[in-house]
Amino acid sequence: AVEHLLAAHPDLPLRHSISFLITGDEEGCAEDGTIRILEWCANQGERLDYCLVGEPTSVKRLGDCVKNGRRGSVNGTITVHGRQGHVAYPHLAANPIHLSLPLLEALVQHPFDEKKNTHFPPTSLQLTRIQSGDGSTNVIPAQLTAQFNIRFSTEHTPESLEKRIRSLLNPLLQGDYRYDLAMQVSGLPFLTQGGPLLQAIQTSIAELLNRPPELSTGGGTSDARFISQHCPQTVELGLVGTTMHQVDESAPVDDLTMLAQIYQRIMEKIFLL
């Protein structure tokens, strides 16, 4: 796309620049990839005006969906402490599994959103792991650990979510029994609402594909969650992602060709109009 842009417009003003950010640490903790490059750019005084992220945002056909934002993601671990004992003498123990049931029920049933955010799906808390004991059939375990993930909109912050969770749990676990709560942020929510980049993307898709794209903030997180902290105009547009993370991941060559044309048209609208 950039090659064709420069060939078609050799007199492109030199005040503009185009950079490629390609890293190999996008999955998992994602600590030594995009984050490090963005830190370097900030230290060098580099300013990012627009960022087009090539995530596979298309759902059924190329260009049918554009991600103009993403939900935030926070992982949490709750450890409920009871008292270990023999199952035949429950009065001498405190079963952390029993203690945890009302706590977990309160979490999964809680409506986190007081008002609907029209740009984001509802906040979702999903339990991802529950572990207690070592498999012994005659022992009441000493503790239970439950892990969860929350996907949230710009209506919330990690701090407000932790405060909400503690306000739910504190009344349910009193006396000598206690819980520990640890939360780790894996991404903050962002929203690009209007602006030159989003307008250029929507117009380019409509011109080349004869249909407007849908704007969405659903799905998982991407490196855009890091980039948006440095570049307020961050939007994602890419191929159809039906085979991503699968054996023989693939995309039609025609889609690749058309996507390059869309990217070129977007840059022309940004740089030349």
Give a label for each model feature.
Residues 1-31, 74-80, 89-111, 148, ...:
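Alpha-helical metal-binding/catalytic segments enriched in His/Glu/Asp
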Residues 1-69:
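Acidic/histidine-rich catalytic neighborhood of metal-dependent amide-processing enzymes
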Residues 30-34, 92, 157, 161, ...:
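Residues at alpha-helix caps and immediate loop-helix transition turns in enzyme cores, especially N-
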Residues 41-173, 182, 186-187:
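Midchain, well-structured core segments that form catalytic/ion-binding scaffolds
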Residues 78, 148, 201, 226-227:
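Structural element of the ATP-grasp superfamily
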